[in-house]
C-alpha cells in the first residue's frame, strides 16, 4: 500500500511537471483579415492568455531574405507582439513559407553557404526589429514538390546555421535566445525524402507535426481529415494515414518526445457525396464539398461552420466525428476528439499541442454554443496549463475604443476613399490611434495597439 501510494505520488509529480512544461502552439494567418465581418480575424483578436506560443503565418522571402507578404504585415506584427504587454510569458514566432509559397525560393536559398548566411543574417535582423521571439520554418517540402533530393541535407545545414547564429547572437547581445522551430509533414514518403530527423531534432527547439490532411476531396471516397488511429481493417499505406502512425514515425526516426508538438486542426475536410443515401466513411464522392458561408473555399469548412450540422456520427475506432446533410459530407474535430488527442499526447510524453489555426475555431463563441475558442480552450484545460489569473489594476491595458464606422467599407462619407489609391495603409485625420486600410478597392478602419498612434512617415503604429 505504501509503495502504491508512493508511486501515485511520483506519477502526480510527473504530471504536474509535464503540465507546467506543456506547450500550446497556435498559428494565426495574415489573410483572415479579409473574411466577412462576422468572422474577420486580426492579431488583436487573439486571447493573450490562451496559447503559450503564437506563430504568425506567413512571411515570404526575396533575394534570400525574409520579407513581408501582405501590405500591412508590419502593423499586424505590432498588433500581435503588443499582446505581450498583457501576458509577458507569451512567445511569438514568425513562420516563413507555407503551402502556396512553394519550394523554389527555399531551394535557391539553401543552395550555397553564402545564400544561407544571407538568410540567417536577415532573419536575425527582421525578428529583432519586429519584436518576435523566434522563427518557424514551414518549407513544404524539402525533397518534394519540385525540390531536389539534395535539399534534404541542405535543409539540415540551414537549421544548423540558424541555431548556431541564434545562440551566438544571444551570447553577444545578452538577449534571450531566439527560438527555432519547424512545421513538418506526417506522410512517410515526404519525411523520408526531406528530413534528417535525428539531426534537425538536435538543433530545433520543437517540431510542429502537421497531423492533419490525411484525407481530402482529391480522393474518390470520403475519409477523415485527422483520425487518431487507423480504421479496423486498414493495412499497408492506408494504415499509416492517422495521427498515431505519424507520431510513431517521428519518434522512431529520432525526435525526442518532449520536442514533438502534436498538430490538430480547427477545420474539416468536406466532400460532395455521389449519393446522399451512401454517407458513411469510405462512401463514393464526386469532388470537394460546397464552399462554407464564411470561409468560401471548396472542400474546407471551419469548425464554426461544421459544428451546427445535425446529422453527426463518430468513427469509434478513430476517435473522431463526421457529419452530413443532403449530399454534403464533412470530417472534422470537436471537443471530444481534441480531448482524446490531448490524452494521447500526454500518454506519449509529447511536448504539447499545436493548432492550425486560431481563426477557424469559434473564436467569438458566436456559432457553436460552447463559448469562445471551444476547441483551443479544451486543449488548454486538458494540458493542465494554469488558468488565466486576473491582472492587477496597474497591469490592465485598455482595449482600443470601438470605431464609429464599420470595419468593412464602403462607409458613410468615405465611399470613394480607396478609389485611385494603391492597396495600403493611410492615416485617419480624425483619429491618429486608427488608420485606413485599402485592399482590393474596399475600405477598412483598423486600430493601432493600445498606446500607439499611426504615423504616415513610416506607415506604422509607433509611440506618440
Curated annotation (Swiss-Prot):
Give the region (Disordered) as residue ranges. 385-416
Q: What class of enzyme is it?
A: hydrolase
- Give the GH18 domain ranges: 22-386
GO BP terms in the entry: chitin catabolic process; polysaccharide catabolic process
Q: Which residues form the signal peptide?
A: 1-21
Gene3D superfamilies, alphabetized: Glycosidases
Provide GO CC annotations from the record: extracellular space; lysosome
Q: What is its main location?
A: secreted
Where does it localize?
Secreted; Lysosome
Record EC number: 3.2.1.14
Sorted keywords for this record are: Carbohydrate metabolism, Chitin degradation, Chitin-binding, Disulfide bond, Glycosidase, Hydrolase, Lysosome, Polysaccharide degradation, Secreted, Signal
The tissues where this chain's protein is expressed are given as:
Highly expressed in tongue, stomach, kidney, brain, skin, testis, and bone marrow. Low level of expression was found in lung, heart, spleen, small intestine, and liver. Not detectable in pancreas, salivary gland, large intestine, uterus, or peripheral blood mononuclear cells (PBMC).
Disulfide bond annotation, renumbered to this chain: 26-51, 307-368, 448-461
Which residues does the UniProt record annotate as the domain Chitin-binding type-2?
A: 415-464
- Quote the record's binding site residues for chitin: 70-71, 97-100, 210-213
Family membership noted in the UniProt record = Belongs to the glycosyl hydrolase 18 family. Chitinase class II subfamily.
Share what the entry says about its subunit structure, partners included: Monomer.
State what this protein does.
Degrades chitin, chitotriose and chitobiose. May participate in the defense against nematodes and other pathogens.
Q: What is the protein name stated in its UniProt record?
A: Chitotriosidase-1
In its UniProt entry, the species of origin is given as: Mus musculus
What gene name is given for the protein in this entry? Chit1
Amino acid at each position: 500500500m505504501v509503495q502504491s501510494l508512493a508511486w501515485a505520488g511520483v506519477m502526480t509529480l510527473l504530471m504536474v511537471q509535464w503540465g507546467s512544461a506543456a506547450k500550446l502552439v497556435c498559428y494565426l494567418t495574415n489573410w483572415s483579415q479579409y473574411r466577412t465581418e462576422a468572422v474577420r480575424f486580426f492579431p488583436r483578436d487573439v486571447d493573450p492568455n490562451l496559447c503559450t506560443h503564437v506563430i504568425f503565418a506567413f512571411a515570404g522571402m526575396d533575394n534570400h531574405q525574409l520579407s513581408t507578404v501582405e501590405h500591412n504585415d508590419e502593423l499586424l506584427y505590432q498588433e500581435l507582439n503588443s499582446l505581450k504587454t498583457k501576458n509577458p510569458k507569451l512567445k511569438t514566432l514568425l513562420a516563413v513559407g507555407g503551402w502556396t509559397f512553394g519550394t523554389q525560393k527555399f531551394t535557391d536559398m539553401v543552395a550555397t553557404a553564402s545564400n544561407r548566411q544571407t538568410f540567417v543574417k536577415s532573419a536575425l535582423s527582421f525578428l529583432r526589429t519586429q519584436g518576435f521571439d523566434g522563427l518557424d520554418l514551414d518549407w513544404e517540402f524539402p525533397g518534394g514538390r519540385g525540390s531536389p533530393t539534395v535539399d534534404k541535407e541542405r535543409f539540415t545545414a540551414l537549421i544548423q546555421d540558424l541555431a548556431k547564429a541564434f545562440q551566438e547572437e544571444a551570447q553577444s547581445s545578452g538577449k534571450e535566445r531566439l527560438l527555432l522551430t519547424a512545421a513538418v509533414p506526417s506522410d512517410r514518403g515526404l519525411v523520408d525524402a526531406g528530413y534528417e530527423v535525428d539531426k534537425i531534432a538536435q538543433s530545433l527547439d520543437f517540431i510542429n507535426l502537421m497531423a492533419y490532411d490525411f484525407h481530402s476531396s482529391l480522393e474518390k471516397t470520403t475519409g477523415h481529415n485527422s483520425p487518431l488511429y487507423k480504421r479496423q481493417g486498414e493495412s499497408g499505406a492506408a494504415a499509416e494515414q492517422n495521427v498515431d502512425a505519424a507520431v510513431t514515425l517521428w519518434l522512431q526516426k529520432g525526435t525526442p518526445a518532449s520536442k514533438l508538438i502534436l498538430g490538430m486542426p480547427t477545420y474539416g475536410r468536406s466532400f460532395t457525396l455521389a449519393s446522399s443515401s451512401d454517407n458513411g466513411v469510405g462512401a463514393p464522392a464526386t469532388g470537394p464539398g460546397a464552399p462554407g458561408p464564411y470561409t468560401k473555399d471548396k472542400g474546407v469548412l471551419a469548425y464554426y461552420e461544421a459544428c451546427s450540422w445535425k446529422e453527426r456520427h463518430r468513427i469509434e475506432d478513430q476517435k473522431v466525428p463526421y457529419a452530413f446533410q443532403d449530399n454534403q459530407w464533412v470530417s472534422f474535430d470537436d471537443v471530444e476528439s481534441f480531448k482524446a488527442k490531448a490524452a494521447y499526447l500526454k500518454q506519449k510524453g509529447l511536448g504539447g499541442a499545436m493548432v492550425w489555426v486560431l481563426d477557424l475555431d469559434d473564436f467569438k463563441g458566436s456559432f457553436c454554443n460552447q463559448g469562445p475558442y471551444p476547441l483551443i480552450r479544451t486543449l488548454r484545460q486538458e494540458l493542465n496549463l494554469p488558468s488565466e489569473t486576473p491582472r492587477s489594476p496597474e497591469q490592465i491595458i485598455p482595449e482600443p475604443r470601438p470605431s464609429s464606422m464599420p470595419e468593412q467599407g464602403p462607409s458613410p462619407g468615405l465611399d470613394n476613399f480607396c478609389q485611385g489609391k494603391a492597396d495600403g495603409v493611410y492615416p485617419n485625420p480624425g483619429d491618429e490611434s486608427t488608420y485606413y486600410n485599402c485592399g482590393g478597392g474596399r475600405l477598412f478602419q483598423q486600430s493601432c495597439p493600445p498606446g500607439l498612434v499611426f504615423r504616415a512617415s513610416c506607415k506604422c503604429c509607433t509611440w506618440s
